[in-house]
Design a protein with these regions (language model features):
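Terminal, charged accessory segments of proteins
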Residues: 1-173
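A short, highly charged nucleic-acid-interacting micro-segment common to nuclease
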Residues: 177-181
Length: 181
């Protein structure tokens, strides 16, 4: 019921939709092999490849001062990605909630109503995880809770707060608590 109240709250729903509509992005640079005619900028590394690359084409008929040039050169390619630590954290939170609800469903002493609520919550979380921005996101290698975007950016801040409440509630125990119920 606690996770259900978090997931079904308007604040959490709005936060996930804000993240989906405006996720944290970053540029990643990789090396790609391009045909020599498609290279836009020649850096120092590309110039070295022109002199060393063994896969060459004869251009002696073009009077360029060179007899051969390479067919391809490796050049840096920048790509915009949403696979950031902040988005990995949001995915981790959603999957943690989903895992918790799945565990609740498997408990033998869980009542029918509790199992039904867990199933509804799993459906909502599955819907969130199916958003296009989360399909590119990998599993987190570490949790960076001190990220400025996670603490300040709208949407991320609310998800962090919900996860902290959930995590603290999961760790909460006291002696004699069983006697109360």
């Amino acid at each position: 019921a606690f996770v259900k109240s978090i997931v079904e709250s308007e604040t959490f729903c709005d936060a996930i939709h804000k993240i989906q509509s405006n996720p944290v992005r970053k540029w990643t640079e990789t090396m790609v092999e391009r045909h020599i005619s498609n290279v836009k900028r020649m850096g120092r590394d590309a110039m070295k490849q022109i002199s060393r690359n063994p896969n060459r084409v004869d251009v002696s008929h073009m009077n360029m001062g060179m007899d051969t040039i390479p067919r391809t050169v490796k050049v840096p390619y920048k790509k915009d990605t949403v696979d950031t630590l902040e988005n990995q954290f949001v995915q981790y939170v959603l999957m943690s909630f989903m895992s918790f609800c799945s565990h609740i469903q498997t408990l033998k002493n869980a009542g029918e109503r509790l199992r039904k609520e867990a199933a509804i919550t799993i459906g909502i979380l599955g819907n969130y995880l199916s958003f296009s921005s989360f399909k590119e996101v990998s599993m987190p290698s570490m949790l960076s809770l001190n990220s400025p975007a996670l603490q300040r950016k709208e949407g991320y801040r609310e998800v962090l707060q919900a996860w902290l409440i959930f995590d603290l509630a999961a760790k909460l125990s006291w002696h004699g608590g069983d006697d109360v119920y």
